Amino acid sequence: MLGDRTEILGMCAAALNEHIPIAHLHGGELTEGAVDDCIRHAVTKMSYLHFPATEVYRRRIIQMGEAPERVYNVGALGVENILSVPMLSEEEIRKDVEIPAGMPYAVVTFHPVTMQPGETEQQVRELIVAMREEKQYFYLVTKANADAGGRQVNAWLAEAQRELTNMKLVSSLGMKRYLSAVKYAAFVLGNSSSGIIEAPALGTPTVNIGDRQKGRLMAETVIGCMPEAGAIQAAIRQTEQMPHRPSFLYGDGKTSQKIVKILKEFFHTDYRHWKKTFYDMECK
């Protein structure tokens, strides 16, 4: 199971009741501004094998009572995708998604802030104001996810697109086009995890808005700001002074190889005999 989406809870519950062991990727992370946090931790407790993306997250899973011999720091699949997926050239991606030639651009993704009920609309409005004011950039905006409030976010962004000539809203770019777009972008803007994991590995600065990703390990190229137009604009200007230098906080790009090796070792035994016990850390 990957990550923290609501829909995986049902699959995990079914597997648990059928005594089918679960392997969980990207556990141990914190996103205090989203309900994903609770889902992720719940899946961790239902899982037998754990494949976190950093050493900090590995230790956190152990802190939750999972035995160290079942927890492996393997890095993030997002970094592996960057190192293995053949990218489009800048000219190709600009032509493909109709970004004006010669104009610097940003890739924007803004998801609902599910732990701050009633605040999503105002945060989207502030983002739109910032894009309107920082008109030296073209904004390639991908639609919000399926979280509660996602449709409203997309409606507000569609409304903004009718007004802003320097913005294009797309449903989805797919992995190859998305990573290619981020690679050549001046910066990434919004509150998506891709600004925390993939963008730094590509060397692209990120303006991370609000608390949705609060708690994640962040590279020096990630600039956090309040969800206010003035703060967003100041952070955008700050990216202009930052070098585009890759940062690999989330592994070396060999995640899948490591996972396959570990799974092969575990499946030498009959999984029906696997037992989970609570790993009790020494209390002081």
Where are these regions (language model features)?
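Short acidic-hydrophobic, aromatic-tinged amphipathic segments that line or gate anion-handling sites
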Residues: 52, 72-74, 169-171, 223-228
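Active-site and donor-binding regions of nucleotide-sugar-utilizing enzymes
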Residues: 1-67
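A donor-sugar binding/catalytic signature common to diverse glycosyltransferases
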Residues: 1-2, 9-12, 25, 50, ...
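C-terminal amphipathic helix plus adjacent low-complexity
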Residues: 240-284
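Donor-nucleotide binding loops and adjacent catalytic segments primarily
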Residues: 88-184
